[in-house]
């Protein structure tokens, strides 16, 4: 039995003083350490030197997660979403970032009106750490955790696990005390030098539970999937292999999940958006599906990806590769001369992409600047380009008519050398073909959501709710500081009112600052089982249908819509998918946020690696926020 277990056994019989415990159990230091840990966990209490088990009662406090830890304070995020609580260092009780805790609010905070409190219990400790191994004068090894670098955690004797000073490592807390200085850890995994962006990115993925490698049983299922399409499956699909269908992606894309076909008609346009039919291969009850649900999204950073599906599917049998027969889920739309959808239908199809289009090449073709060899590659589908341009212009007019938000944001593209070292950062350019594909995908997404809502299907919607009034007030104050008098008719502005402000600053020095401020006033889009519309796009109906290789919500509605197309209706459809839609919405929202943070932190490592080669140089920049 451990020393902690022995202490608990003694205290179960009666309260004890330290002297009595050490006489019975020996080893004064171990008894003291066990008592400190039991007190920090809220199991034992001490009063006037007498130790006793706490009575069976729930500790007081608000359920929270510790989200920030500095040397002398921390911040706890309330589970109810009512803001963050400041916790002074002496009141942290050794809590670490990621710990689920209870925090009791002070009746008299030092700052009137603020939320301050103390940790009363650690209900679910997070004992995993990622950080850098350092050595202090005297030779003792410590971990400087990435999430709280000021709070050094001592390594237990022999706990380095072969790691060297300066390495990025994963570690586990092996001992917790009431103070952070009492904690001890041991290295569980060595990534490599903290000077390497690649190794730091690996550590970040690990800390966010993003694994580029699949479990063996999942990999085995993927490897067992036949690459051919059974004739029995081909027989009941709409065969579109004779249509001039093609894909458009970046040159390096390997997981191609969308293709288009388009032609002008007497009354307008016929647009087909053809999406990889992942739901045919990833079935309920399989390990592939369980793993896809757990991941919920692919994570992209630098030149790497941690995929939602094994490459046998994502880059292979599901990917709409040029010249290969593929199963697809198609949205076939009829649009009028103004680009408005008049009708649509969804169908399980069999397609063959004529060409793997590349954004940069198609932009050149549309501009009339492409070389002849490039034009030859696209000769089978180039007849569709005129209709693409016409429909896109009509759709842009439709977007403006409904006052969809047009926020200008810039995204960096990392340039890596052959060794994987970042040697440049460029602004990612968006040409007209990128905008076209985005608009055509949006149409298919809107049609899918319209079907879900009007047919009352259990569903996963992409929801963007209207801005929070408090955030709008902050925006108004920021705009006033920029000399812009924002006068909204109601507490929440309309898309048109916000659009007028964006138009006012477009092309000026204030453009980026105002765009950023407006963006931050918005709610975060998420996935929900109820249709609530999309504020930013100014749409009543919206879902994600077009990327099932890399997003689980898309795969979810493919599965639901497939059963609906097969004739499943009413109570049976609800029985199969009502809870599934709720679970998929929650999981997809959580993992999307996690993926965004992972990607941002990983790419920051590469940007820092690039800037290290420019120490001492001067650059211009913008303040993007104050924390």
Model features per residue range: what roles?
Residues 45-46, 212, 402, 459, ...:
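Residue-level detector of short coil/turn "hinge" positions at structural boundaries
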Residues 3, 27-30, 34, 115, ...:
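Helical mechanochemical/support elements of P-loop NTPase systems and associated helical scaffolds
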Residues 23, 29, 447, 465, ...:
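Structured C-terminal cores of nucleic-acid metabolism proteins
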Residues 114, 119, 341, 420-422, ...:
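A broad structural signal for short, well-ordered beta-strand segments within beta-sheet-rich domains
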Residues 109, 118, 201-204, 221-225, ...:
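Charged, low-complexity, helix-prone segments enriched in Lys/Glu/Asp/Gln
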Residues 155-157, 249, 254-484, 533-569:
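Feature marking long nucleic-acid-engaging regions of large polymerase/nuclease enzymes
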Residues 39-40, 46, 396, 480, ...:
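Alpha-helix C-terminal capping/helix-coil junction sites
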Residues 1-275, 279-325, 356, 360-366, ...:
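Charge-lined substrate channels and their catalytic hotspots, especially those that engage the 3′ end
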């Amino acid at each position: 039995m451990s020393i902690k277990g022995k202490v608990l056994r003694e205290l179960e019989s009666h309260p004890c003083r330290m002297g009595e415990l050490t006489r019975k159990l020996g080893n004064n230091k171990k008894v003291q350490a066990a008592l400190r840990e039991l007190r920090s966990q809220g199991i034992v209490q001490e009063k006037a030197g007498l130790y006793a088990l706490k009575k069976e009662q729930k500790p007081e406090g608000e359920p929270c997660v510790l989200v920030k830890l500095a040397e002398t304070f921390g911040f706890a995020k309330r589970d109810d979403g009512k803001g963050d609580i400041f916790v002074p260092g002496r009141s942290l009780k050794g809590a670490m970032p990621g710990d689920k805790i209870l925090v009791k609010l002070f009746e008299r905070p030092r700052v009137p009106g603020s939320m301050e409190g103390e940790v009363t219990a650690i209900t679910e400790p997070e004992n995993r750490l990622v950080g850098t191994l350092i050595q202090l004068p005297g030779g003792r090894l410590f971990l400087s955790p990435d999430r709280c670098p000021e709070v050094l955690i001592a390594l237990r004797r022999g706990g380095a696990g072969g790691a060297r000073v300066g390495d990025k490592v994963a570690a586990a807390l092996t001992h917790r005390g009431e103070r952070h200085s009492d904690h001890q850890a041991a290295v569980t995994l060595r990534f490599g030098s903290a000077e390497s962006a690649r190794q730091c990115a690996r550590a970040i993925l690990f800390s966010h539970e993003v694994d580029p490698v699949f479990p063996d049983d999942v990999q085995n299922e993927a490897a067992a999937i036949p690459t051919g399409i059974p004739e029995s499956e081909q027989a009941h699909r709409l065969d579109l292999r004779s249509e001039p269908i093609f894909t458009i992606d970046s040159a390096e894309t390997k997981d191609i999940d969308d293709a288009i076909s388009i032609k002008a008609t007497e009354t307008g346009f016929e647009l087909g958006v053809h999406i990889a039919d992942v739901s045919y291969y990833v079935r309920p009850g399989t390990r592939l599906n369980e793993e896809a649900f757990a991941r919920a999204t692919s994570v992209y950073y630098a030149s790497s990806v941690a995929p939602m599906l094994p490459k046998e599917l994502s880059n292979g049998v599901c990917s709409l590769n040029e010249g290969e027969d593929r199963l697809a889920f198609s949205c076939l739309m009829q649009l009028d001369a103004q680009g408005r959808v008049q009708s649509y239908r969804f169908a399980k199809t069999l397609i063959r992409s004529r060409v793997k289009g590349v954004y940069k090449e198609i932009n050149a073709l549309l501009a009339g600047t492409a070389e002849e060899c490039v034009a030859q590659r696209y000769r089978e589908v180039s007849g569709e380009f005129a209709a693409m341009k016409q429909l896109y212009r009509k759709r842009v007019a439709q977007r403006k008519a409904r006052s969809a938000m047009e926020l200008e944001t810039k995204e960096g593209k990392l340039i890596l050398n052959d060794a994987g070292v970042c040697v440049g950062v460029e602004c990612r350019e968006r040409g007209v073909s990128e905008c076209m594909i985005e608009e055509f995908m949006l149409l298919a997404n809107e049609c899918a959501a319209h079907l879900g809502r009007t047919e009352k299907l259990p569903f996963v919607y992409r929801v963007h709710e209207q801005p929070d009034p408090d955030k709008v007030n902050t925006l108004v104050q920021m705009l006033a500081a920029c000399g812009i008098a924002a006068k909204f008719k109601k507490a929440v502005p309309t898309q048109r009112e916000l659009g007028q402000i964006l138009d006012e600053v477009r092309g000026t020095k204030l453009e980026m600052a105002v765009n950023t401020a407006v963006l931050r006033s918005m709610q975060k889009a998420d996935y929900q089982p109820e249709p609530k519309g999309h504020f930013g796009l100014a749409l009543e109906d919206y879902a994600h249908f077009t990327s099932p290789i890399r997003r689980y919500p898309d795969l979810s509605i493919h599965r639901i819509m497939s059963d609906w197309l097969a004739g499943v209706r009413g109570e049976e459809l609800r029985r199969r998918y009502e809870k599934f839609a709720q679970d998929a919405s929650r999981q997809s929202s959580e993992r999307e946020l996690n993926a965004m943070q992972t990607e941002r932190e990983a790419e920051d490592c590469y940007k820092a690696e690039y800037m290290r080669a420019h120490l001492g140089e001067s650059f211009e920049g913008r303040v993007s926020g104050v924390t």
